């Protein structure tokens, strides 16, 4: 009985231990969506440059990610690779990279650093175009395996708070202010 209790105690200590993970940028998936005129959507992906996370008892404790904004890409079916609309796709990507929007030449990365976690919501500092605001990652799911972790969640932010806007007010009005991100990360123990 004493041996069984010692094993149970050891397992409880392991389960309660904090584990640090390095996020693998090659397997990370960060998708984005923006809505125009309330009906037309643009969506795509952006690559992760690096990331780290600390998990304790299956709960995210801390973490940060750096996003490579120069990798922003569109997955709109209207701009498929074999489509004749490649010029339109290039125009969209050029506009997203421009100073009006993400200004990737000046700000090649964006970051998110967790400041607190409550339940399945992580609050943190999002920095885009050199501007930092508090944002929330919701629907957070953390799954630990043998030396691995999987983290998913959603983040919606107001692009206006980061200066992501057309210079023309009339054009800017056709685009919803909310940009939605879906994040799927995996990492290995450090």
Which residue stretches match the model-derived regions?
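Low-complexity, acidic/polar, glycine-enriched regions of mature
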Residues: 1-190
């Amino acid at each position: 009985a004493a041996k069984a209790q010692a094993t149970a105690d050891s397992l409880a200590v392991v389960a309660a231990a904090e584990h640090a993970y390095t996020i693998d940028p090659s397997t990370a998936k960060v998708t984005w969506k923006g809505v125009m005129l309330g009906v037309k959507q643009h969506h795509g992906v952006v690559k992760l440059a690096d990331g780290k996370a600390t998990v304790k008892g299956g709960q995210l404790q801390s973490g940060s990610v750096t996003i490579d904004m120069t990798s922003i890409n569109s997955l709109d079916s209207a701009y498929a690779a074999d489509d004749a609309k490649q010029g339109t796709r290039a125009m969209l990507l050029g506009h997203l990279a421009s100073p009006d929007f993400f200004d990737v030449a000046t700000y090649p990365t964006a970051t998110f650093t967790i400041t607190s976690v409550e339940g399945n919501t992580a609050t943190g500092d999002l920095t885009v175009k050199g501007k930092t605001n508090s944002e929330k990652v919701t629907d957070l799911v953390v799954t630990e395996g043998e030396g691995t972790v999987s983290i998913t969640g959603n983040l919606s932010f107001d692009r206006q708070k980061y200066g992501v806007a057309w210079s023309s007010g009339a054009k800017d009005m056709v685009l919803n202010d909310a940009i939605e991100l879906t994040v799927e990360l995996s990492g290995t123990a450090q």
